[in-house]
A protein has these predicted regions:
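Glycosyltransferases and closely related glycan-assembly transferases
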Residues: 86-100, 107-122, 135-140
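Donor-nucleotide binding loops and adjacent catalytic segments primarily
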Residues: 44, 49, 53, 174-261, ...
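Short amphipathic alpha-helix
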Residues: 18-29
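A short, well-ordered alpha-helix in the C-terminal region of glycosyltransferases
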Residues: 331-344
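Acidic donor-binding loop of glycosyltransferase active sites
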Residues: 96-98, 256-270, 278-279
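Active-site-proximal region of nucleotide-activated glycan assembly enzymes
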Residues: 35, 45, 56, 115-175
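Conserved nucleotide-sugar phosphate-binding/catalytic loop shared by glycosyltransferases and other
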Residues: 5-13, 30-82, 225-227, 310-312
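C-terminal alpha-helical cap of glycosyltransferases
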Residues: 343-366
Length: 366
């Protein structure tokens, strides 16, 4: 009787920037015959997305420690203790062969308990500036991976492999092939994230209204559920036509359609823009911890594939001046530069590392 296939425990939660790379890894591991379980929280985006992917979700009662009030800080040791105990129970019950952490609230307690029980622990940091949890876990992890260079000190021994992105994005045709027959007005994609971005919703339509009507690009704008009405009103008042939705379900199709994207600079977004091969105007979220979105954007700005405008500096005049001077031929050059920086094999490299970390007596079952 053959042994069951290896069980890999993915730890990620809180935001899509942590969860989507974890889901990409889970899909790659399943294709290789592995079983996958997930450790997260009940309040993060993983509570919906992970069960929808058919993955068993285990949750910890923990929240972030940074930027909290005094009461939350005083209760933090108690909350952490409960979460460590809950993580220990999960580890003992599941007995995973390998544990992989992507960051987020549950990753800290889970990673500590995995290490204490001698389970191989792998850590992947998505941002150019490593988050607090991953900085801690990097000290005890068996292997550390990153989406951008220099996220950790050299002493950590980190491998830069890029960020896992969804296959449908990596599989898009190269920019030159996609744009070969395009004529007429430019195609502008505006992504405010699933929750929207108030600055983009207000400034983009005002900037477009400053352009002659015949020179305005075709626009698709993801406004977010909370700020959809604001965006609809802003475009209406500006007299600018646009396709405005709360959320774009098929983002790969939207990337394939666009000539240019205006967006925040979360690690996953930057990785997807590179994988798709798109020039971008990044507007980093101004309240991101350690200003990591500016560092993320710098990866493609340095490559000559993108622009970066700080949120406070994004005015209709500045954005309108930039958009008014763009031509598709010049954008294609930036698109190809972006595609050259992509790491389409990131998820396969990470999946291979997981299997290599499986104890030898279990590896044959994969």
């Amino acid at each position: 009787m053959s042994a069951p296939s290896p069980l890999i425990l993915v730890m990620a939660g809180g935001t899509g920037g942590h969860v989507f790379p974890g889901l990409a890894l889970a899909a790659a591991l399943r294709e290789r015959g592995c079983r996958v379980s997930w450790l997260g929280t009940a309040n993060g985006i993983e509570a919906r997305l992970v069960p929808e992917a058919g993955i068993e979700l285990h949750t910890l009662p923990i929240a972030g420690l940074r930027g909290k009030g005094l009461a939350s800080r005083l209760l933090a040791p108690w909350s952490l203790g409960i979460s460590l105990w809950a993580a220990l129970i999960v580890m003992i019950r599941l007995r995973p062969q390998v544990v992989v952490g992507f960051g987020g609230f549950a990753t800290g307690p889970g990673g500590l308990m995995a290490s204490a029980l001698g389970r191989p622990l792998l850590v992947h940091e998505q941002n150019a500036v490593a988050g607090l949890t991953n900085r801690w876990l990097a000290r005890i992890a068996d292997q550390v991976f990153a989406g951008f260079p220099d996220s950790f000190p050299e002493s950590v021994g980190c491998r830069t492999i890029g960020n896992p992105v969804r296959r449908e994005i990596s599989n898009l045709a190269p920019p030159g092939e996609r744009w070969a027959s395009r004529k007429g007005r430019l195609r502008l994609l505006v992504l405010g994230g699933s929750l929207g971005a108030r600055t983009l919703n207000e400034v983009v339509p005002a900037a477009l209204s400053s352009l002659p009507a015949e020179e305005r690009p075709l626009v698709r704008h993801q406004a977010g559920e909370r700020t959809l009405d604001l965006a609809l009103d802003a475009y209406r008042e500006a007299g600018v036509d646009a396709e405005i939705t709360a959320f774009i379900e098929d983002v790969a199709e939207a990337y394939g359609w666009a000539d240019l994207v205006i967006c925040r600079a979360g690690a996953l977004t930057v990785a997807e823009v590179a994988a798709a091969g798109l020039p971008a105007v990044f507007v980093p979220y101004p309240h991101a911890v350690d200003d990591h979105q500016t560092a993320n954007a710098g990866f493609l700005v340095t490559a000559g594939a993108a622009w970066c405008i700080q949120d406070v500096d994004l005015t209709p005049q500045r954005l309108g001046g930039l958009l008014g001077g763009l031509r598709r031929e010049a954008l294609l050059d930036r698109a190809e530069r972006a595609r050259a920086e992509a790491r389409p094999d990131a998820v396969q490299q990470l999946a291979a590392a997981c299997l290599e970390a499986v104890p030898t007596n279990r590896r044959r079952a994969a």
